[in-house]
Amino acid sequence: MPSTARSAPPVGPRLLTQLAELHRRHGDVFTMPGVGLHVAGPALAKTVLANLGADYAEHSDFFATATGFLTPRDLQQRIARQARDLLTAYTAAHAADLPRLVVNLAPEAVMPDAGNRLLHEHLGPVLLAAGTDPSVRAVVADVVTHAVLAGARARRGRLRRALLRHRAYAALAAETARRRQDPARVPTDLLDVVALAMPEGYDPVQAADVFLSLLFATVGSTGFLLSWALYLVGRRPDQADAPPSALVRETLRLWPVAWMFGRPAARAHHLGPARVEAGQTVHVCTYLVHRHPGHWPAPEEFRPDRWLGGVHGAYLPFGWGAHACTGATVATGLVADILSPLLAAYDVTVCDDALQPQVGPALAPPPHRLRLTPRRHGRR
């Protein structure tokens, strides 16, 4: 999944409501005061993200680093492809581990953190293989706790965040350099994928940031997707027996983790009725695309059965075009594979009321307690 939607507008508890109201009043292209132009229509959203007319600067949310975008494009593609293939092989080989991990959530789990930690435990060996320096493992675990979990960054001061960033960069740079010393080494984990793909004279900060993007995508975004799916089923237990793949798709429709994609205009042009100036950022809001009343019947309702007929056109949970997330199938398949044994074995109930999503660069579920009660007769 995309690591984050890095160009999201300022966050706040009422932001989604404000965006929906602006969409209702002004249509599929509208301006949010102080933020800029937003797109809520699927056709225009695809136009912006596909960028076939080169109206926007080449942009990849995943490969944005502290020192600029990792380039060239073929390097991005090589890393993305190798990471996807490694994750695909790992998840297939370790699918039998999932029922054991699911049991650890019972009888009650604090979500969404428990979902992120489940993903970290399951994917730990493909993030950092056996033999990785223990200090690197420790700092990556700290990054999960203090940066990946929903709301974690807001709970730490700027200085402590900076110190953690410095520790992570130093540890990952040293481990990357060590791994590159072996000319015969082949990728056995995601850090290898990044380390061995980087060219001579590479920027160690960029290498570290790309690995951290992989960490955020696998443990963060995919963990949020899992938690959202369980949250929705916990609110609508009558939907628990829907096909897991349909549950995942409908979850991503209602609550796309990557909910906002910003694209800077490379030149002046028109987008629908709006004039876009060079340098202006256009925000594609997939949250609004996925709830567009002109494209979805009962858009606010959780209805997994709407996916039994195939994929809908007004659906962009992983972006669109050349820079769409290459790991989409891995992420959705893994979450479906977790839901299958979990919902076969347990009824799930959300124990808290009147909850609001955590709106930030990623759209995360609200903190809540999820109760898992053993099913007497399995799935109906």
Where do the model's predicted regions map?
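Conserved cytochrome P450 K-helix E-x-x-R motif and the immediately C-terminal K′/meander segment
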Residues: 8-23, 241-274
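Conserved cytochrome P450 K-helix/beta-meander segment immediately N-terminal to the heme-binding cysteine loop
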Residues: 53, 285-310, 351
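Cytochrome P450 heme-binding "Cys pocket" and the immediately downstream C-terminal segment
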Residues: 330-363
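Central I-helix of cytochrome P450 enzymes
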Residues: 123, 190-251, 335
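Cytochrome P450 catalytic-domain helical core, especially the substrate-recognition surface
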Residues: 1-15, 35, 40-178, 375-380
